[in-house]
Amino acid sequence: MNFKKIVTSLALLSLTMTGCGITGQSKTNKPSLKVTEQEFSKNKSYAKKDFDYKVDPETFQLSLTTNGKTEIVAQPQQPRKIADYQETASEISWSCPDEHVEITLKKEKDHLAVKILNQAKKDNTFSWPKIDAENYTLPIAEGKSIPNNQPEWLKYFLGNNEIDLLEAFSMSFFSINQSNFATTFVLDNTFNSQMIATTEPHLSFETSHTFVGFDPNKTLNYRIYLTDNDPVAIAKTYQKDRVALDKFKTLEQKAQENPEINKMNGALQIYFWNNRLLTSDDVKWQALAAEIDEPIFKWIGELLAKYGEDGDEEYQSILPAIKAGEAYKYEQNVFLNSLNYVLLYPEFYNSDIFTKPDEVASKLIEKGVDKLTEQERYTLNQHLMAGTLGTDVTKPLEQWGQKASTDVLTDMKKSGINKAWIGLPNWENGLMNPKMVAEANDKGYLVGPYDSYQSIQEDASIDWNTASFPNPTLYEDATITNKKGDKIPGFLGKGRKLNSTLIFPDVKERVTGILANNIPINSWFLDTDAAGEIYNDYDPTHKTTQADDVDARLKRMNYLNSLGMVVGAETGNDFASEGMVYAHGLETPVIMWSDPDMRQNKESEYYVGDYAAVDGGIPSKYNKVVPIKDEYKPIYTDPLYSVPLYKLVYNRSVITSHHWEWDSYKIKGLTGQRRLQEYLYNTPPMVHLDQATWQDRKEDVVQNAKTWTPFQEKALQHEMTNFSYLSEDRLVQRTDFGADLSVVANFSKTDFQLGKETIPPGTALIIEGTKTTLIDTRTVEK
């Protein structure tokens, strides 16, 4: 098949356009319900209804014919023993006694239904279909179009040949592109489904499904659709299927339940780092030198020695330099990290050290230190420390950290960033600095913490508060056991994975504790909950299935939504599409966990960075700009192999962006290309900011926001209704959002002529009716 045939006649259109830009807040009225219903109704026309099929039960080879053209869509497998063959006018069925399954094929109005019914009482794996095509359209991340002979993809699948569909695919389908048509295999879900990739003589796949013995659902359903070789037809057919299954919920429907969701429309995705309440600007270093022998500093060392993950050795080593008036950058960082660290400790209060607490601290002590909420405990510790250090050594407490937090947010709003999601790396960042959270809320921003219920650690340090729970029974009684009887290790091999079905009371306890003092958090981000790390738990005391796991995750999403939170989750795989509003990780997923040059070799130019920042700002893992190897570009970033499958389905349902490890600026030499794709795909830009990075990136972030916010406000009012290639090399691409909003991105190295408009390389043209705006990324790289 020649994909150049897909090139649309849009390239030949002569359009009359003016130079008016998309600037300022959107004043466009939302389209009527009738308009959006019309956009949905077109989906009915994509699947071919006039088709025939032929199946060989022994090999399960399946052929489909339409318009006199036949393709083998499921390749023959090793012959199986069959029994109970029956054929009627509408159905063919048989059983495979050795595999303990019954198979039924039925031709429906617009698809072929294949039902595989498991009869085994124990775990049972059945493989089908085996697919071999010239090209594959797969929902890997946002979407990929993969030729069967592309060298980098072959190398990738050679090293990653076992594919867990629940984790690897963002949606529950896969498509093959053959000479005459595309065939799309749609599943109810991808629970317990895998693919094995073969790379010789070219790329092919075989899918299998494991029926879990204790799972009450014994049926695997495929709905097989025929469409043109067009990603729009494939995606819209899948969208129609999801709507029919009642598994589709628009942002408008979600906002009816929680109006705060409207703040996400047009919002930049900003991870905001303020890990220090007490900053270098807040300390009077020369005055400190004379006070360094005071008991409080000895007490801080004792706390670090007893409770700190790294002990007190480094802290003790810098005290003599501070006393000598030689508090340089290193000494200041160690000192500030130590003081901010102990502010988190429940054990910080010591009546022998803090003999004269101020009024606020005294009232909190009277309540009982062990009865305080987490926010109250932080408030107590701050007042104890500030009162003991005094204003001779530090600025007044109310000024601590504000220059690096509230002042930055104020400047963001003043500079023209009208809509933003502000993500905090942990809820403690908000509870330690509630003024900053209030400032974000007052500015009309969404603000909320990163949270995780993936893992639990036994005796977790305060650094791992997401892996720590007050309930002492969870580690033994609520963790996941695999089929072999082993506990599944937690993140980075620490602790264990939690069973989501067993911890809902603990979720409520954590959330209630965080919100106990009415801190104005209005968003919540859930790590891993839409990333496909879903499990069957074989523990005989609490056997649960992947379906149970997903239901439990949706339950906690719905709980947070009921509290007025705008809920987001990692990646955005669509089993969670009804529960989340936004997702991070779909547009740029985590790139190559397994490459040591990126993950272990700190001398490599590709090393992505460290999790910790010695200066309390953004860890280098998130703000260090690094190149990626050429072999990874076709897999992760090359627009030649990317297709907006997810956006064609969920543009009006889930707002998706990059994984936080790979924000819009992270990849050296690709910031401009990725920005073009952000507009083309309606993907919010993401950036990690602290005080210093805000000053560094301010001009570019603000300038981009002036166009981005009104653009997305309009784009979210419609389906993504079309995606097309405008050039023979497929490097000039167009997306349409309804009838009056389009984006044309030029990823090539030559000018592209669209009617009277010249679109230079490295630019994108936004077309809104007769108005155009040029997005020029040619100077965005630093």
Model-assigned labels for residue ranges:
Residues 9-18:
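Bacterial N-terminal signal peptides
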Residues 268-269, 436-488, 565-575:
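Glycine-rich, aromatic-flanked loop segments that form ligand/cofactor-binding clefts
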Residues 1-7:
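Bacterial N-terminal signal peptides that target proteins for export
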Residues 20-22:
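N-terminal Sec signal peptide cleavage junction
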Residues 429-436:
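Active-site-adjacent beta->alpha loops and helix N-cap segments on the catalytic face
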Residues 55-60, 202-234, 281-283, 288, ...:
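Active-site-proximal substrate-binding groove within the catalytic cores of carbohydrate-active enzymes
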Residues 379-391, 463-497, 536-544:
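Aromatic- and acidic-residue-enriched carbohydrate-binding clefts of CAZyme catalytic domains
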Residues 29-419, 439-447, 451-453, 566, ...:
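Carbohydrate-recognition beta-sandwich/jelly-roll modules
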